[in-house]
Amino acid sequence: MINYNFRNRTSFPEDFLKKANVIKQIQNRFYTYGYDQIETPLFEDYDMYSNVQGTVQQDDMVKVIHSSGRVLVLRPDVTIPITRQYVETDMTSHYQRFSYCLDIFRFNETQQAYRTQAGVEFFGDESPEADAEVIALAIDSLKDLKIAPFKIEIGHSGIYKELLEQANLTDQEQQTLHALIQSKNISETSSFLDHLSIDQDLKQKIELIPMLYGDPSTVIKRAQAIVTNETMQQVVDTLFNVYSLLKDDQIEEYISFNLGLINNMNYYSGIIFQGFTEQIGQPILMGGRYDHLSSQFENEIPAVGFAFEIDKLLTLITPGDQPLITQADFLIEYQPNCRQDALLLARRLRQANKKVIIQPTESSSKIKASNIILVDSNSYQLKSSDIQTTFSSIDQTLQHVLKKR
């Protein structure tokens, strides 16, 4: 029996603020690239996902029964509903850039049943410039978060697909070969291919796939050696053009190629990429080109995108990379006979959109605040990291603290 992980995630204030800050930085970067934020429904018809091939496994979806008897699912994916909505509107005549930050829900034996993703979808443009744009956006977002070191591994499904067609393998043989190539198990791959009825030249080309990784220029040269038709040549040309654009953008230091990156081949139709850091053995972002997904909604439109795994990013954020987490902008403490003045000061600060906590001086509560104001019968004493001074009135106090900020 499989025990799925349904742990509740309660985000306490410091964790919530840390996550909110990461999301805000990512959303700000998405905005600077021209991506407009959208949202998809939390509940969707089960049929929409079950009828789309090569995407979400049916057993992974969290299903619920509507009072009408319809089977619904909690959102297991964002790209599919965005693609459907785009196809069903009149927006398909022009390029469209969307961004999102949403929770997705899937059964998983080892992870929580839901997680947060932030990503983008770029519809209508099949050019290498579009591929390079979303990769550059991913890189800039990671740089904003001061996550280092990291690498974006870029692959392409085209060459491997062409070799598979020539090999004419069964579904089971393809699955076995996929697993061996993705794990870069060279010896087992060779042994497995030896037992198949394929010619020696094709076998050698397939064996090269897991070794085509590393420096992009080197990988492109080595990939050229196994090109046998125009389709494969177009793949190499696409990789060359995308890398040239990334070099023009002066971000090639973050790029490596991996033509053994062949996951979700039924979903991705071209460029595939993943983001990795040394600290985590799993991708912190995944993306690629999925030009054929929209055809399952009866209108084929080129598209490329990616999504960050926010919860994985949070494990990489160090305290020094985040703003100081405090419980309040101002802590107002007051003597018993000065409560009215303290309440008035708190109200004025809150009207200026400041976060304020107020308590009597004898309170034992320990509050972390950027500024402390002690209100007694004759003065307002301000204590902050860079100043300690006394004012004679509320107006004088407000004039100083609000002007300063």
Swiss-Prot record:
Major location (coarse): cytoplasm
A GO molecular-function descriptor: catalytic activity, acting on a protein
Pathway as given in its UniProt record: Amino-acid biosynthesis; L-histidine biosynthesis; L-histidine from 5-phospho-alpha-D-ribose 1-diphosphate: step 1/9
Domain of life: Bacteria
Cellular localization per UniProt: Cytoplasm
Role this protein plays: Required for the first step of histidine biosynthesis. May allow the feedback regulation of ATP phosphoribosyltransferase activity by histidine.
Protein name per its UniProtKB record: ATP phosphoribosyltransferase regulatory subunit
Organism of provenance: Oceanobacillus iheyensis (strain DSM 14371 / CIP 107618 / JCM 11309 / KCTC 3954 / HTE831)
